[in-house]
């Protein structure tokens, strides 16, 4: 199946502790149906001291289920579903079903 959410997309969280927050997708993990989103689903990690870093408690993003995310509409930033269409020049692109705007390309 084609990827509806890709790295670099602006997404909105639909459910959970961070409902309504938005951010950029840093990484998609297709085998687990999860994604890392900047500034969303932050957890505290206890960091061991290394040569480059000192010890302490660090906040970092944890993976979130793809079903809990929706792509933000390029026009108004609200959550939208994603569709696919083929342009006249033969390229297959994703578009926002809410506004009809092309997401990539």
Curated annotation (Swiss-Prot):
Domain of life: Bacteria
Coiled-coil positions: none
GO molecular function, one term: rRNA binding
Signal peptide limits: none
CDD domains membership: KOW_RPL26 (cd06089)
Disulfide cysteine pairs (residue numbers): none
One BP annotation, GO: translation
Family that this chain belongs to: Belongs to the universal ribosomal protein uL24 family.
Function, in words: One of two assembly initiator proteins, it binds directly to the 5'-end of the 23S rRNA, where it nucleates assembly of the 50S subunit.
Protein name from the UniProt record: Large ribosomal subunit protein uL24
Species for this entry: Methylocella silvestris (strain DSM 15510 / CIP 108128 / LMG 27833 / NCIMB 13906 / BL2)
């Amino acid at each position: 199946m084609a990827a509806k959410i890709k790295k670099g997309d602006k997404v909105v969280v639909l459910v959970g502790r961070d409902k309504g927050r938005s951010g950029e997708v840093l990484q998609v993990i297709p085998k687990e149906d999860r994604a890392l989103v900047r500034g969303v689903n932050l957890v505290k990690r206890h960091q061991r001291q290394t040569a480059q870093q000192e010890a302490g408690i660090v906040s970092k993003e944890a993976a979130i289920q793809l079903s809990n995310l929706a792509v933000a509409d390029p026009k108004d930033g609200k959550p939208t579903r994603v569709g696919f269409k083929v342009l006249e020049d033969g390229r297959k692109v994703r578009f926002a079903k809410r506004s009809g705007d092309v997401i990539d390309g």
